[in-house]
C-alpha cells in the first residue's frame, strides 16, 4: 500500500509487459492497472500504457484519480449485498460484521483497501482476469445506493431503523 503526497492510497493491481510483433522482431511496452482511493469511501481505477514502467504507472494513477467515485459505507462495510458484472466475470460483495476484515483476493482486495472498507466478504466468479474482476467490482460498487439517496428518489422520509 503506497501513500501519495496528496493523501491517496495507490495500489498496483497488475503490471504487464506486452509485445507487438513487427517485421524486425518484437516491440515491448508496459501496461499498468492501478487503483487509487482516499480511504474514506472514494475509489477509482486507471489503465496506463507506455514504453517504460514509471510512465505507465503515472498514466494509470492519473486516470484513476480522474475516475474516482464515492461509495456509501456504513461503519466500514457495504450497506447491502450486491453482484457486479463485467464481461464473463461477476463479483459478489457482501457486508460483514465488524472485525471480519477484508476477505477478498487480488483486484477486489485492492479496491476495498483503497476505498477504506474494513469488513467485507467477496467472491470473484467466472474469471480470474484482473481487468474484468476490477471492472465487475467497480460496476457493483457504482450500483450501491445509500438509504438517504433511495428515500430522496422515492420521495419518502427516511425513518430510523427498527431494532
From Swiss-Prot:
Domain of life: Bacteria
Keyword Magnesium: no
UniProt keyword list: Ribonucleoprotein, Ribosomal protein, RNA-binding, rRNA-binding
Domain S5 DRBM: 8-71
Biological processes annotated in GO: translation
GO cellular component, one term: small ribosomal subunit
Any one Gene Ontology molecular-function term assigned to this protein's record: structural constituent of ribosome
Pfam family, one: Ribosomal_S5_C
InterPro entries: Ribosomal_Su5_D2-typ_SF (IPR020568), Ribosomal_uS5 (IPR000851), Ribosomal_uS5_bac-type (IPR005712), Ribosomal_uS5_C (IPR005324), Ribosomal_uS5_N (IPR013810), Ribosomal_uS5_N_CS (IPR018192), Ribsml_uS5_D2-typ_fold_subgr (IPR014721)
Assigned protein family: Belongs to the universal ribosomal protein uS5 family.
PANTHER family: MITOCHONDRIAL RIBOSOMAL PROTEIN S5
Subunit structure: Part of the 30S ribosomal subunit. Contacts proteins S4 and S8.
Function (record text): With S4 and S12 plays an important role in translational accuracy. Located at the back of the 30S subunit body where it stabilizes the conformation of the head with respect to the body.
Domain notes: The N-terminal domain interacts with the head of the 30S subunit; the C-terminal domain interacts with the body and contacts protein S4. The interaction surface between S4 and S5 is involved in control of translational fidelity.
Record protein name field: Small ribosomal subunit protein uS5
Amino acid at each position: 500500500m503506497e501513500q501519495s503526497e496528496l493523501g491517496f492510497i495507490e495500489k498496483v493491481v497488475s503490471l504487464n509487459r506486452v509485445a507487438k510483433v513487427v517485421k524486425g522482431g518484437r516491440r515491448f511496452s508496459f501496461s499498468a492497472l492501478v487503483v487509487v482511493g482516499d480511504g474514506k469511501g472514494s475509489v477509482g481505477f486507471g489503465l496506463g500504457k507506455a514504453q517504460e514502467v514509471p510512465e505507465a504507472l503515472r498514466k494509470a494513477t492519473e486516470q484513476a484519480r480522474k475516475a474516482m467515485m464515492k461509495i456509501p459505507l456504513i461503519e466500514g462495510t457495504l450497506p447491502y449485498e450486491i453482484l457486479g458484472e463485467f464481461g464473463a466475470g461477476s463479483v459478489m460483495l457482501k457486508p460483514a460484521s465488524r472485525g471480519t476484515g477484508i476477505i477478498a483476493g487480488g483486484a477486489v482486495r485492492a479496491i476495498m483497501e483503497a476505498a477504506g472498507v474494513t469488513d467485507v466478504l467477496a467472491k470473484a466468479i467466472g474469471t480470474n482476469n484482473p481487468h474484468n474482476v476490477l471492472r465487475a467490482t467497480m460496476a457493483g460498487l457504482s450500483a450501491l445506493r445509500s438509504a438517504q439517496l433511495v428515500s430522496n428518489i422515492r420521495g419518502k422520509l427516511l425513518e430510523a431503523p427498527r431494532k
